[in-house]
């Protein structure tokens, strides 16, 4: 949480000094979340100061959780698209739809012994569905770019940081797609953009498995 929020704080600090117009300091939600999620990974050389002998365990768990989050976050957005397109759905129909999506996005999870989840009510624990409709997909797009920064960091930490700093300095002067392309990265909207990132991270996870 600390490095995540520090990413937001750092972006504000830099933006207020680099960008003339205050209205252009903060980017869209997915851009802002890229600041924070990327900082979680780019601070990895200092993770030992937090976790000491458990640093390797944390870094492995962090990378795995980031990858696992992508199908779940996408499922949340897919569910909202269906629900908002069909406002007359009954509670049972919504639960049935969530169950169907679980089998598509997370078929490896067995909910049979968990009544709340097995009846398809798991979507109710996701606060964003109630309070921040359609915000969750922003996390997915930001996480994808953050993982791209992490993949760069594994091979060339200085280049990864330089691109990240350039990304931050642009603040909200460009769209999310414009920001990502400006620093030479692929956007999550490009076909085939996620595959190479997952492959790179998969190799790292296998190499650092505990």
Which residues are covered by each model-predicted region?
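Catalytic Zn2+-binding segment of zinc metalloproteases
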Residues: 7-21
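Active-site-adjacent structural elements in folded domains
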Residues: 22-23, 61-66, 126-130
């Amino acid at each position: 949480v600390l490095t995540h929020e520090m990413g937001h704080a750092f972006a504000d600090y830099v933006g207020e000094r680099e960008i003339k117009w205050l209205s252009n300091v903060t980017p869209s939600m997915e851009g802002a979340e890229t600041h924070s999620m990327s900082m979680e990974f780019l601070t990895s050389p200092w993770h030992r100061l937090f976790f000491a002998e458990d640093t390797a365990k944390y870094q492995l768990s962090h990378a795995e959780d980031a990858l696992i989050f992508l199908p779940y976050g996408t499922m949340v957005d897919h569910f909202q698209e269906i629900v908002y397109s069909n406002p007359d759905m009954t509670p049972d129909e919504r639960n049935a739809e969530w169950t169907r999506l679980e089998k598509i996005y997370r078929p490896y999870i067995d909910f049979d012994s968990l009544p709340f989840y097995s009846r398809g009510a798991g979507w109710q624990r996701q606060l964003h569905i109630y309070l921040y409709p359609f915000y969750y997909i922003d996390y997915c797009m930001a996480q994808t770019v953050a993982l791209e920064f992490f993949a760069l960091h594994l091979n060339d930490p200085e280049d990864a940081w330089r691109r990240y700093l350039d990304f931050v300095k642009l603040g909200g002067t460009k769209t999310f797609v414009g920001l990502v392309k400006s620093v030479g990265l692929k956007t999550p909207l490009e076909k085939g953009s996620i595959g190479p990132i997952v492959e790179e991270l998969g190799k790292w996870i296998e190499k650092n498995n505990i």
